């Protein structure tokens, strides 16, 4: 099952938590869920160039708090905060409630699965060779502390007549290990030959404590590296200095 299921959904309540955090009765639940989907779709399409990793939605009493994790927060905020005020007003109109916006910077986009997938998709749309784009992403992730990464690209790669799937993997990606901190992201590249799908799995180390917020807390602290990867980087630097 670990090979088939979404790795984030598989670990919910263990070391991952939900992106929508609110409670509602049966009468309101469907409406609020569709509001969340609508807001996420709007933010991802409106701020495509800002490198959106994820959108977390919380609903305190009769209010809405939206946290946007972005690789380029400056593009969202705009000059003197003008753009973020416009975005806040649009989201308030969608929810018919007071909306608060928080922008969180993703310090290492090279080890964020969603941003890696989006980057590869943009390169494929610019006609960059898919193998080169995948290899470059793998090397960048491993260099910046990932313990393992796997990337698959599916579709009419390189304009081939028959669609196929190509993949690269480096390091460990233990999908069955529930304590493993595995980030997963997808993206679609709209090429001249059709749509290509990209999937990315990134293994960032193990989380030993049973804490649904552990993965998010690690990301917020900018500690995307696990202890094993830090030791490996230290040994690599020591060997380079001795050479």
From Swiss-Prot:
Gene Ontology cellular-component terms for this entry are: cytosolic small ribosomal subunit
* One GO process term, biological-process aspect: translation
Instruction: Return the SMART domains for the record.
Output: KH (SM00322)
Q: PROSITE patterns attached here? A: KH_TYPE_2, RIBOSOMAL_S3
Listed Pfam families: KH_2, Ribosomal_S3_C
Q: Which UniProt keywords apply?
A: Ribonucleoprotein, Ribosomal protein, RNA-binding, rRNA-binding
| Sequence segments annotated as region (Disordered) | 214-243
Record carries keyword Ribosomal protein = yes
Domain (KH type-2) ranges = 39-107
InterPro entries (UniProt xref): KH_dom, KH_dom-like_a/b, KH_dom_type_2, KH_sf_prok-type, Ribosomal_S3_C_sf, Ribosomal_uS3_bac-typ, Ribosomal_uS3_C, Ribosomal_uS3_CS
The residue ranges flagged as biased composition, category Basic and acidic residues, are 229-243
Give GO MF terms, alphabetically: mRNA binding; rRNA binding; structural constituent of ribosome
Judging by the UniProt lineage, the source's domain of life is Bacteria
Q: How does it assemble?
A: Part of the 30S ribosomal subunit. Forms a tight complex with proteins S10 and S14.
Function in brief = Binds the lower part of the 30S subunit head. Binds mRNA in the 70S ribosome, positioning it for translation.
Q: What is this protein called?
A: Small ribosomal subunit protein uS3
